[in-house]
């Protein structure tokens, strides 16, 4: 059996966020292989999450994130089972990561696919069924293609199906499951709201010069009329000088 070092345990914890004992066990089960240990922990995390999913999660915190420039803001509620876990730095970091994820995903509108209203799915199906590239396809093939496209579209609207911005190899759903395995409690994203500065406001088109003049109590300057163009005439050729008259010779 390969000896598991503290450095290996630390590396695995940094990559997965799992607890120290879980990391040590994962490495032991996989002969010190980091990659296999990560897969083992993911499987364990999924199992742990399924077992804890039915538990009531009424504690937690409401996290916020304001993007640089103060043009995008996010509020998100993430729940756990006890306020002991809610106070832990690992949980606070998770909430902040989820808030940043929402800020980075303008198309995301729902926590999970199951939250998306049926009428939206029906509208997507109507759009896809009418596409020209499916016009000559057999009905059974068309249905399969449309189902795949709808599934992809609905996942684009779902937060839990987004690739995690800090690690594209996992989704937000997997991130939560890793946190469940590490913290030992059911953790759920309940709701969120994304704010964009000026969103939904129709901006009035204004004449900038007139606006400045109005603020200064002056009349807006009249536009300068273009000067009329004068057609230039070609210069007339100069008249030839008449030869001087010959004088009479004196006798």
From Swiss-Prot:
GO CC terms in record: cytoplasm
GO molecular function: translation elongation factor activity
Domain of life: Bacteria
Keywords: Cytoplasm, Elongation factor, Protein biosynthesis
PROSITE patterns: EF_TS_1, EF_TS_2
Compositionally skewed regions (Low complexity) per UniProt: 219-229
Keyword Cytoplasm among UniProt keywords: yes
Cell compartments where the protein resides: Cytoplasm
Region spans: Disordered: 215-251
Database matches in InterPro entries: EF-Ts_dimer_sf (IPR036402), Transl_elong_EFTs/EF1B (IPR001816), Transl_elong_EFTs/EF1B_dimer (IPR014039), Transl_elong_Ts_CS (IPR018101), UBA-like_sf (IPR009060)
Location of region: Involved in Mg(2+) ion dislocation from EF-Tu: 82-85
Record field: compositional bias (Basic and acidic residues): 230-239
UniProt KW Cytoplasm keyword: yes
Reported function: Associates with the EF-Tu.GDP complex and induces the exchange of GDP to GTP. It remains bound to the aminoacyl-tRNA.EF-Tu.GTP complex up to the GTP hydrolysis stage on the ribosome.
Family: Belongs to the EF-Ts family.
Name of protein: Elongation factor Ts
Lineage: Bacteria, Bacillati, Cyanobacteriota, Cyanophyceae, Oscillatoriophycideae
């Amino acid at each position: 059996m390969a000896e598991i070092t503290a450095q290996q345990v630390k590396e695995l914890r940094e990559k997965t966020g799992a607890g120290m004992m879980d990391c040590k066990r994962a490495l032991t089960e996989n002969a010190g292989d980091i990659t296999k240990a990560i897969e083992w922990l993911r499987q364990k995390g999924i199992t742990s999450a399924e077992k804890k999913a039915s538990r009531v999660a009424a504690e937690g915190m409401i996290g916020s994130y304001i993007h640089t420039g103060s043009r995008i803001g996010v509020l998100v509620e993430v729940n756990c089972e006890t306020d002991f876990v809610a106070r832990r730095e690992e949980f606070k970091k998770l909430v902040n990561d989820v808030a940043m994820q929402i800020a980075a995903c303008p198309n995301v509108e729902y926590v999970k696919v199951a939250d998306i209203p049926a009428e939206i799915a029906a509208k997507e199906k109507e759009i896809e069924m009418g596409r020209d590239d499916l016009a000559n396809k057999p009905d059974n093939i068309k249905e399969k293609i449309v189902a795949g496209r709808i599934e992809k579209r609905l996942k684009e609207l779902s937060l839990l199906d987004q690739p995690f911005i800090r690690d594209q190899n996992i989704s937000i759903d997997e991130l939560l499951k890793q946190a469940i395995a590490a913290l030992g409690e059911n953790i759920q994203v309940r709701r969120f709201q994304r704010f964009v500065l000026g969103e939904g406001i129709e901006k009035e088109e204004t004449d900038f010069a007139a606006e400045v003049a109005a603020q200064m109590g002056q009349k807006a300057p009249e536009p300068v009329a273009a000067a009329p163009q004068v057609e230039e005439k070609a210069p007339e050729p100069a008249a030839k000088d008449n030869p001087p008259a010959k004088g009479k010779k004196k006798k």
